[in-house]
Amino acid sequence: MNNVTKVMSVSIITNTFLSLIKIIIGFICKSSALLADGVHSFSDLLTDFFAIIGNIMAKKPADEKHPYGHGKIEYLTSIGISMVIIILGLTIINNSMHSKVVMSSLIVSIVSLITITLKYLLSEYIIRKGKKLENNILIASGKESRADVISSLVVFISAILSVFSKYIEVFKYSDKIAGIIVGILIIRTGFLILKENISIILGEQEIKGETLNKIRKIILNN
């Protein structure tokens, strides 16, 4: 098992746990926001699987049909990830707009708070490893996880506001609005990943300093 696979394995285990917890609790409590957040975690899970598959394919040696290797697969995989994320975001917005108005419970707040903590630690871990290994798929996965932290924070705030809906009527829509906001955040993440990887494929992305130094060393040594 290589370094990338190890990192993604940790992410898969964490996202599977969080996704199941949020979807189950969201369904029981009829919370559109928590369900949306659960689907967001599920999209992280899809990202992880894509990352592992893309990394394996990118490591294949060069052949007659691919004399420069299969490195581009890494970026194409990231583009595939971004498309899945965008579709999930649109689906969440649609479902939230047509959901019933409900009051969030204390358990929704607790689950969201736990998620915020775990996802923040996970996202920082993945991004740090991705930069160290110079692996674009890991970085894309880490950014998606970071967006999940923000969406969980939105759910947490909406759950708190919902408690005060008895006194301020407009707060009863907080769960519904939070679901829509989470959907927008997911779509934004998808577009950012899509833009970055298309730029790399088209040669528009600036080469990072560390990579540039390696290229210079290779040229000087030859």
Explain the meaning of each model-derived region:
Residues 1-209, 213-217:
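Alpha-helical transmembrane cores and adjacent cytosolic helix/loop segments
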Residues 220-222:
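Short secondary-structure junctions
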